[in-house]
């Protein structure tokens, strides 16, 4: 069963918190990974790998560059889960 947007957001917020220390309540759909959350490319790749494991999805490297906001990542994960 696919997770809800809120469940994916909460799970992604936990992964971001684990990697960067950013408070989970600071992670919102409209937040930019680079501009708002100041996540660098190395941390982003770690978050992507952990998200692939947590949500059982594959995020191709060429798609990662399209994930500008948390909402972009949540939408991608939702689509990938079917």
Predicted regions and their residues:
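Residue-level recognition of oxygen-bearing side chains
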Residues: 8, 32, 50, 69-72
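Thiotemplate assembly-line natural product biosynthesis machinery
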Residues: 2-25
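Generic C-terminal helix-cap and adjacent flexible tail
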Residues: 6, 78-82
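C-terminal structural segments of small proteins and small subunits
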Residues: 65, 71-79
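Core alpha-helical elements of the protein kinase catalytic domain
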Residues: 14, 49-50
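Two-component histidine kinase catalytic core, primarily the HATPase_c
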Residues: 43
């Amino acid at each position: 069963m696919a997770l809800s947007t809120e469940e994916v957001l909460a799970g992604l917020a936990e992964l971001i918190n684990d990697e960067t220390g950013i408070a989970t309540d600071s992670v919102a759909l409209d937040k930019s990974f680079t501009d708002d959350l100041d996540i660098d490319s190395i941390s982003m790749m770690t978050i992507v790998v952990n998200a692939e494991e947590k949500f059982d999805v594959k995020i191709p490297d060429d798609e990662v560059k399209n994930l500008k906001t948390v909402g972009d990542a949540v939408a991608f994960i939702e689509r990938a889960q079917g």
